[in-house]
């Protein structure tokens, strides 16, 4: 058994309620845990500059900002850097099961996971969890920014906000989008958009300032994808484009030597059918993927340059 720790800091403003600001600080180390998407990962350092040094730096910067600015906010702040996220949200789950503060006094939780690769052309910022409190969407729509914001209502997702949502706490998760370096040694500091991350943090500050004008947020459950119920025995070796808003599952990158690459799938293809499942979005794709096992062969249909292409893929 390997033990690890969550790192927690508390800013006491003498307020009734507390805002939690968090990010995971773990990554993939030397590529030995089978989570790497590199073709030959073992022994290669995976620094995880975007995933998730960017979020960890965001926690530290917001802690510095709120500790030094004047006047005091109407909230206390709990800053947390979680361990064990890559292995299954272990750090945030452990904290939520053994909190150091009264959770009935937590107003909401903000999670930052991969906020360091803002695309300067699209300016896409994805915000998950907007359905977890009635005030989130009107507030986000009200705040002026240069971002092209994609809102996702679900409280459950593949990052640490999920642990807090499951404790009936409103959440937001900020994400600048997927990229070809995800879970690879090439996710390094030279590719971080520092100015873009600064803008994301300034936007989060605006969100927090807006919530100061409101009563304690009201939690509401959302319709969530059943990601936790599925078990995956196979992978295609491709990267979904989570910011894609069209019909189908847009491929952001394809890993060389994996089933998708061998079948002829390319970056930019849009998967519209996998096996017997029509794919309208990423969740449909994941649902289809969960039905296969190693050495299965199935048909996959993609749209490429406006034309449908059929091909066979073997897992």
Where do the protein language model's features map onto the residues?
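His/Asp/Glu-rich mid-to-C-terminal helical/loop segments that flank catalytic regions of hydrolases
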Residues: 57, 64, 68, 180-226
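Conserved PDZ fold ligand-binding element
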Residues: 260-282
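Soluble metallo-hydrolase cores and metallopeptidase-like ectodomains found primarily
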Residues: 1-47, 61-64, 68-74
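Terminal peptide-recognition signature
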Residues: 21, 59, 238, 260, ...
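Acidic/histidine-enriched alpha-helical segments
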Residues: 72-80, 109-112, 211-230
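PDZ-domain C-terminal substructure recognizer with occasional recognition of PDZ-binding tails
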Residues: 272, 287-315
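Metal-dependent peptidase/peptidase-like ectodomains
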Residues: 14-16, 82-173, 193-195
